[in-house]
A protein has these predicted regions:
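Bacterial N-terminal signal peptides that target proteins for export
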Residues: 1-8
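Accessory carbohydrate-recognition regions in carbohydrate-active enzymes
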Residues: 24-394
Length: 394
């Protein structure tokens, strides 16, 4: 198989079709993103497996199904944001029909479709169909209910933090480690008939705010509601910034257009490496591996500012995006040298972020495992130094 580095983006061919709303049509032309198999590596025999992550390249908002690995037959609610690569996520979304409300609903599931830019699944016991597409700091869910004789609910669980229920709006935060918070602002295109806080398995409409473990807001929609679209923004700065991120990125509830835009972004990013010859399997392995390179680090600059857990402060980025959640022990050998060849600008910003981390921690030591919640100082040696040395040599 012959490799070619192509700095110019290739022509993009949309394969988003009418079948299922956003699934790929059969086409004679496949883009690099069509070879990506996010399920590859999802079963681990020793360490942590890979996860089928839905996100845009190096973007702050990442999700994957709430399950242990590919063999797990249940989902613990629906995801809203991953806050640590292969580590943890924040918040839970639980659409539900019935009278046994809980902060997180465990779902059996089937007919899952998962692309880097799109997710679809049937929650079969609940008879609910879910579609999802992300942007950089916001995302969109489409929830289709089908049981006509049961009430229609949506639960938003903060897990460990605070939540507020308004008229078609829910906002709040989840407390992470090292004085770090992730904030949420979520809107519905369907006005609920009532909102409140989950208490003892029921919706308390007289209560609009809650704090602590499993603080959970509830939206109750009119009987017979078939489809609810939810759009949300996330932030590590504030609830207000989460709202701004949503408004900047998602002007409407058009999931099809959002998924198509995500596909084009992925195809352009992966097209920096072109191949000739080889088998379909070879191309799957190559482009899936390249897709993994874009999982981390993530850019957490929001409108020119970012929260740094390395000193617990909000900083201006002065036009240079701030990246973290890298786990350098995993990435210094291949991911960083490759990124320098195919995306020199991003690699420069990543290395600049390391230097800012060292300054913010006050000891001028380069980070070893930079995460959203700061540097966890794992693994021996300091591989950021090797990363900088390699970049300087190139």
């Amino acid at each position: 198989m012959k490799f070619t580095h192509c700095l110019a983006s290739v022509a993009l061919v949309s394969v988003l079709g009418a079948c299922g709303g956003v699934q790929n049509q059969v086409t004679d032309v496949k883009g690099p993103v069509d070879y990506v198999n996010p399920y590859m590596g999802n079963i681990s025999h020793l360490l942590v497996p890979t996860f089928p992550t839905i996100h845009l390249p190096n973007s702050m908002l990442r999700v994957y199904p709430e399950r242990a690995d590919y063999t797990t037959d249940m989902l613990n609610g629906l995801p809203l944001i991953v806050t640590s690569h292969r580590g943890s996520s924040a918040f839970n979304l639980s659409p539900y029909q019935g009278d046994k409300l809980r902060p997180v609903i465990a779902y059996s599931y089937d007919n899952e479709i998962l692309k880097p830019y799109y997710y679809e699944v049937i929650l079969d016991d609940e008879e609910i169909k879910v579609k999802y597409a992300p942007s950089h700091q916001s995302a969109l869910y489409q929830i289709e209910y089908s049981q006509q004789d049961k009430p229609v609910y949506m639960m938003i669980n903060s897990r460990n933090g605070a939540i507020k229920a308004g008229d078609g709006v829910v906002s709040g935060y989840q407390q992470l480690e090292n004085n770090t918070r992730v904030y949420l602002y979520i809107e519905s295109d369907v006005a609920p008939i009532e909102t409140g806080i989950l208490a003892d398995g029921k919706i308390d409409v007289d209560k609009k705010e809650a704090e602590g473990r499993n603080a959970c807001a509830v939206m109750h929609f009119a009987d017979g509601t078939k489809t609810v679209n939810l759009r949300y923004g996330i932030s590590f700065i504030s609830e207000e910034q989460a709202k701004k991120n949503l408004q900047r990125e998602l002007p409407d509830y058009n999931l099809r257009a959002l998924a198509e835009k995500g596909r084009q972004i992925w195809d352009k990013a992966l097209s920096d490496i072109q191949v000739e010859g080889g088998s379909e399997t070879d191309k799957q392995v190559l482009y899936t591996s390249l897709y993994r390179v874009f999982e981390r680090p993530v850019c957490i600059s929001e409108d020119g500012r970012y929260f740094s857990a390395f000193d617990g402060k909000i900083h201006e980025d002065n036009g240079e995006p701030f990246y973290t959640d890298d786990w350098i022990w995993d990435t210094y050998r291949a991911a960083h040298p490759l990124r320098l060849l195919i995306d020199e600008g991003t690699e420069k910003n990543v290395i600049d972020s390391y230097l800012r981390m060292a300054e913010q921690m006050g000891d001028m030591w380069m980070p070893t495992f930079p995460e959203i919640t700061g540097d966890s100082r794992r693994m021996n040696s300091n591989h950021a130094v090797a990363t900088v040395a390699d970049a300087a040599a190139k």
